[in-house]
A protein has these predicted regions:
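Ligand-binding loop in jelly-roll beta-barrel domains
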Residues: 28, 78-79, 89-118, 188, ...
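Long, low-complexity, intrinsically disordered segments
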Residues: 291-317
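Glycine- and acidic-residue-biased ligand/ion/polar-headgroup-sensing regions
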Residues: 49-51, 58-74, 176-204, 209
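Ordered, small/hydrophobic-rich secondary-structure cores
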Residues: 11-93
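Histidine-centered metal-chelating micro-motifs
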Residues: 52-55, 73-74, 81, 85, ...
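A short, N-terminal "cap"/entry segment at the start of jelly-roll beta-barrel domains
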Residues: 1-38, 114-166, 259-263, 268-299
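C-terminal functional regions that serve as terminal interaction/effector modules
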Residues: 189-196, 201-285
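Short, flexible domain-boundary/linker segments around small modular repeats
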Residues: 37-50, 163-178
């Protein structure tokens, strides 16, 4: 998720553009909210024009789709506002159409947008991870269940949780007159979009309906407030931990140092092992197909984590 810090951005300020990538049918428009220029992963506001039709097919990148207005039909099932779809890479979904049009958010997590017409899954696809739900109608609001927690008045609906990274996708709301007076930063990337309503943040000002941010790790944000409340959709790439404090002048390096110091005290044995191990490629026996060479930062005893290995050629069907 190597995208630059973007905050604030309001998609109402830019026009839609026609989707012209190979494979995509005509009738889809987009507004680019954030983009990883290395691998093409991106977040977009999308518009399906009335009469849009897409045949059965799959993407080489997993993606998430959230419908904000209008409706789409997948197979014979109609999905209206509040509908969330997670499609793993290589999983083919049924024909998609939008007779009257729809707007939504779409997230391509690990690669550029792609569409390949197909009525069957890729041989390595994980269909068991496919998920579709109408979060407005079929999920309850809950208080945040992570600690340290946000102030009372902020509630969530968890749409997807990654058991390996602990990254998650969630709806969230702030009640009218919500406020929180401290400052926070996280060890993860965090992005959010305001479906409705405005909130205020000390560093970045007001974020209205259509407002968006992509926030990289260790960026101070807060205090927070919302006069009338908001409804938003948020995502993280790894576990969300709230490092709260009250000093608005700390920088990224100081926040990193503080987080590392906390790790030393919270997980001392793990910290010592990570720093003393030579060729540091820990293998998770539950995820043996994801050895650290391919999907995680690591080092070879020299402490240099930003390096690359030659990629093995992948066969595509």
């Amino acid at each position: 998720m190597a995208r630059p810090h973007i905050e604030p951005f309001v998609d109402r300020d830019v026009p839609f553009r026609k989707m012209t990538l190979p494979g995509f049918p005509k009738g889809m428009q987009y507004k680019m909210l954030s983009l990883d220029t290395d691998d093409g992963a991106c977040t977009m506001t999308v518009l399906f024009e009335p009469g849009y039709k897409q045949p059965p097919g799959m993407s080489y990148s997993e993606y998430e789709l959230f419908i904000m207005s209008g409706s789409i039909t997948i197979g014979e099932k109609v999905w209206g506002p509040g509908s969330y779809v997670f499609v793993p890479a290589g999983v083919a979904i049924e024909a998609l159409s939008s007779p009257r049009g729809a707007t939504g958010l779409i997230f391509y997590n690990y690669g550029e947008p792609s569409f390949v017409e197909s009525d069957s899954d890729h041989k390595h696809a994980e269909r068991n991870r496919l998920a579709m739900v109408n979060a407005y109608e079929n999920m309850h609001w809950t208080s945040t269940n992570f600690f340290p927690a946000t102030a009372p008045g902020c509630m969530v609906k968890v749409l997807r949780f990654d058991p390996r990274t602990h990254g998650f996708t969630f709806l969230y709301c702030m009640t009218p007159n919500f406020w929180q007076d401290n400052i926070s930063y996280h060890d993860c990337c965090e992005e959010a979009y305001h479906i409705w309503g405005s909130s205020w943040m000390m560093q970045f000002g007001d974020l209205p309906t259509g407002g968006y941010f992509w926030r990289t790790p260790y960026i101070n944000h807060g205090a927070f407030a919302s006069k009338l409340g908001i409804l938003g959709l948020g995502r993280t790439d790894t576990q969300l931990y709230n490092h709260f404090h009250f000093n608005p002048w700390t920088n990224i390096e100081e926040n990193q140092e503080r987080a590392a110091s906390r790790l030393i005290h919270r997980n001392p044995e793990l910290y010592k092992w990570v720093n003393s191990h030579g060729h540091n490629h820990p293998i998770d026996f539950e995820f043996d197909h994801g050895h650290a060479h391919g999907d995680m930062a690591h080092h070879h005893g020299d402490g240099v984590v930003e390096h690359k290995h030659k990629k093995k050629k992948r066969s595509r069907r």
